Design a protein with these regions (language model features):
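Acidic, Ser/Thr- and proline-rich intrinsically disordered linker/docking segments
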Residues: 2-18, 24-67
Length: 67
């Protein structure tokens, strides 16, 4: 069973709450404050601009899933 995390993503409409599946996260970039999701059918992976608190929450969930 995969974990999901709620984050606040910055879009052209402002801050939007979004639920992402941890299994879909490729990596977390703390310098750019972005979460990069895996690209399956798309050629370009999706980058989500978010807050530092959400970056740490996603990182904790990724580490928890490794165990």
């Amino acid at each position: 069973m995969s974990d999901s995390v709620f984050i606040y993503a910055f879009t052209r409409y402002g801050w939007v709450e979004e639920c992402i599946d941890i299994d879909e996260v490729a990596y977390v970039d703390f310098e750019k404050s972005q979460i990069c999701l895996k690209a399956h059918d798309a050629q370009i992976p999706r980058m989500i601009q978010t807050t530092s608190v959400d970056l740490y929450n996603v990182e904790k969930a990724l580490l928890r899933n490794r165990r």
